[in-house]
């Protein structure tokens, strides 16, 4: 997770407390020699960070966690690193928790902890000092195809998230989502390209989306499904023509099989989805993209968007609207100190919606206000809410002229 550290150090200018292992602080030249994507120009440009110069960050407090704190757990896992990772993601590891407590007790002014993984050991250590833990990750909709989104969750990421709980809380708070929206309109708001409108007659009954074998989604939040179990499930549960899309980051290649065709990422993901009447996934974000294209999805694992996958169309629109505009966060805000502090006040869902929609509108500053009106989804209260934000934005622009 080098990018996570580099992004935080680039975006957050004030002093940080870094709890890490020694290898994260090695010179970037080492990672360049090993060809890691995080130190390439493309990686930096895509995620908006610079390679850090640790020597000029003297005000950062760095706490090195000894990896020996995980050695007993690794032994218990039979030296299986994947099993250890699952344990790391789902259980409290006593020695590791104590190592984190030792690091936290050296710093008495921590506002929150930013992490990229579910980590019960970290949660337990932070709870001892009443420090909020915020789980951040790349969101399911990403640039350049979509507006870049991220996950910002006080409960978990990938699995064990607060998405569904927050949706029902928003309803109780009186947030009125516009049921007259079409799912295609929601997608149109987030998609950057308008060149995918050509209709393609689906030729496959089921599209099967595979995932990286040792990713946290599979190891910890798959309801015990892996790629092989997914293929077995598809064979036993679905008749008709099938196509399988392996993940480009997979370490394995599928053998040819009479039961399905293979798309080795020759198609764009959008063209792949267009060719399918239904999508089967464990918990890939491709499932969300399919839902936004009105393609039926079967989700077998745990994921943040699964609660949106309901049969009632009006209810699905409401849930997707909340998920896209309130639960998901504009990526540029993930490491924004002002935004993080805003969320630490536990604002209402109306306030979160307002912050996100206003960001999306203002980020399209090259557009005229009239153009923005035509490209804005009427999310809340049949559009009255957004029209108020547009008026606010227009007045702000006039003041700055």
Predicted regions located by residue number:
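Active-site donor-nucleotide binding/catalytic segment of nucleotide-sugar enzymes
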Residues: 195-250, 345
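A donor-sugar binding/catalytic signature common to diverse glycosyltransferases
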Residues: 114-125, 266-312
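Active-site-proximal region of nucleotide-activated glycan assembly enzymes
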Residues: 114, 127-192, 321-331
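C-terminal amphipathic helix plus adjacent low-complexity
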Residues: 167-174, 308-401
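Donor nucleotide-activated moiety binding/catalytic core segment of transferases
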Residues: 92-104, 225, 240-293
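N-terminal subdomain of nucleotide-sugar transferases
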Residues: 1-44
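Catalytic donor nucleotide-activated moiety binding site of glycosyltransferases and closely related
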Residues: 67-79, 83, 210, 229-264
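Active-site and donor-binding regions of nucleotide-sugar-utilizing enzymes
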Residues: 2-8, 52-159
């Amino acid at each position: 997770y080098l990018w996570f550290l580099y992004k935080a150090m680039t975006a957050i200018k004030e002093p940080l407390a870094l709890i890490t292992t020694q290898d994260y602080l090695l010179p970037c030249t080492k990672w360049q020699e090993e060809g890691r994507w995080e130190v390439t120009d493309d990686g930096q440009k895509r995620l908006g960070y610079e390679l850090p110069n640790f020597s000029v960050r003297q005000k950062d407090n760095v706490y090195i966690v000894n990896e020996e704190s995980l050695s007993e757990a690794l032994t218990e896992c039979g030296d299986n690193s994947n099993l250890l990772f699952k344990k790391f993601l789902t259980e409290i590891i006593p020695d590791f928790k104590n190592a984190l407590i030792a690091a936290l007790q050296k710093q008495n002014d921590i506002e929150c902890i930013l992490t990229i993984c579910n980590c019960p050991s970290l949660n337990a250590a932070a709870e001892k000092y009443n420090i909020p833990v915020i789980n951040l990750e790349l969101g399911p909709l990403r640039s350049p195809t979509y507006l870049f989104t991220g996950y910002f969750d006080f409960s978990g990421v990938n699995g064990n998230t607060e998405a569904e709980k927050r949706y029902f809380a928003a309803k109780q708070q009186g947030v009125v989502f516009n049921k007259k929206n079409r799912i295609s309109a929601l997608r149109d708001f987030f998609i950057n390209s308008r060149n995918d409108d050509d209709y393609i007659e689906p030729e496959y009954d089921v599209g099967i989306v595979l995932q990286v074998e040792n990713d946290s989604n599979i190891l910890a939040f798959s309801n015990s499904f892996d790629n092989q179990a997914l293929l077995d499930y598809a064979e036993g549960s679905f008749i008709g023509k099938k196509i399988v899309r392996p993940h480009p980051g997979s370490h394995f290649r599928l053998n040819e099989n009479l039961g399905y065709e293979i798309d080795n990422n020759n198609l764009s993901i959008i063209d792949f989805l267009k060719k399918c009447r239904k999508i089967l996934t464990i918990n890939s974000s491709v499932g969300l993209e399919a839902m936004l294209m009105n393609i039926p999805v079967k989700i077998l694992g745990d994921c943040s968007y699964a609660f949106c996958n309901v049969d009632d169309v009006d209810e699905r629109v409401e849930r997707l609207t909340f998920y896209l505009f309130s639960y998901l966060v504009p990526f540029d805000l993930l490491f924004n100190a002002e935004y993080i502090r805003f969320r630490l006040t536990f604002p209402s869902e109306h306030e979160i919606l307002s912050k996100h929609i206003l960001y999306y509108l203002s980020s399209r500053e090259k557009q005229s206000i009239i153009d923005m009106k035509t490209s804005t989804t009427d999310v809340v209260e049949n559009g009255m809410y957004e029209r108020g934000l547009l008026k606010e934005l227009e007045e702000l622009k006039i003041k700055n002229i």
